Amino acid sequence: MTYGPCGGVGADGSCEVGDFRCTFLDLPLPRWTGGREIRGPGAGHELLDLAARRPLIVSMLPAAPLDARSITECAAPLRGTVDAVLAGDAATSRVQFPPAYRARLIQDEGLRVWAGVNCRDRNRVALEAELAALAHAGVAAVHCVTGDHPLGGGRPDAQPVFDLDSTRLVALAAEYGLLVSVAESPAAPPVELRTERVGEKARAGASFAMLQYCGGAAEVAAFAADCPVPVLPGVPMIVDREGARLLRSFAAAVLPEGFTETILDAADPLAAGIDVAVRHGRELLEIPGIAGVVVAGGVAPGAEPTFAEALGEVTRALMLHAGGALRPRGPDEWILTRPSE
């Protein structure tokens, strides 16, 4: 990694890989010095047009890995309730369909794709080919991350690549005309340099920042006010203890006070999880200048369809709150329209 520190820095300054201090904490923040040739946002114009009118509603797609049928099943509850789905990495399922192929499967289900690309699994040649394929597939945007170390996921036996890091990947994606977002962890050390770090990624070509959980709406608002690009904070979706355990494992993730307890102590954690996520999402959408929200969480194997239904309930409510309008398209389907239509 050249442009660190990544988001995997613990509150005590430790690296997520092992019991040692992040080496970047004692160094000046690396500055972006590379040039960039941006060909235009391509298919990203649709998202930019929406973002100019109202906050974006994005969600994860909780499909089982390497399962096209699961993608179809989990896409149905989200169709028409989100502006795009984030098809990114998964800590418990490192082996996924390649981003461009997965994007095509999702697009076939009528959803825009915000495709996640990490630097852990491919060298720069393979990454460039993947970005070219995503641009050709017409994805709405790409989310460029360095990627979690494999020691912390479902395939600790895999060798990490990290030929590039997220900042250099951003520049490469921008050259292909892709609309680019990056990740940031506002609560991870060095906290005082996190917005500057986003600034360096913006200089490389990033247009949005998706935020790791960093507390309540006040904490998000404080970070957003100083961030050089529009932000999409995360709305944590918890419906059971396994999902709560996964979110607690994220480095430097800070959930709103009492968030998890309110859900797990309820008689119906699923219903409570939906209610709490909607209320928190609405609070985030009220932050001035917010670009949108990303609803996501941990899902137990086999529970993907139920989790997708819950996500759809949350995103439907947040879409209406954000100013979008929903109308029936079929017996059990919805499509998004502008309020004036």
Which residue ranges define each predicted feature?
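Active-site-adjacent beta->alpha loops and helix N-cap segments on the catalytic face
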Residues: 68-69, 93-106, 122-130, 148-172, ...
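Cysteine-cluster motifs in flexible loop/terminal segments that predominantly coordinate metals
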Residues: 1-38
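Acidic (Asp/Glu)-rich catalytic clusters
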Residues: 48-51, 73-80, 100-110, 131-139, ...
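Active-site pocket-lining/capping segments in soluble small-molecule metabolic enzymes
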Residues: 4, 45-50, 63-65, 147, ...
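Short, acidic/polar
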Residues: 65-78, 124-133, 191-200, 274-283
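Conserved, mostly hydrophobic/aromatic
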Residues: 85, 134, 201, 205, ...
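Catalytic beta/alpha-barrel core
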Residues: 60, 84-95, 116-119, 142-145, ...
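Conserved N-terminal beta1-alpha1 strand-loop-helix module at the mouth
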Residues: 40-84
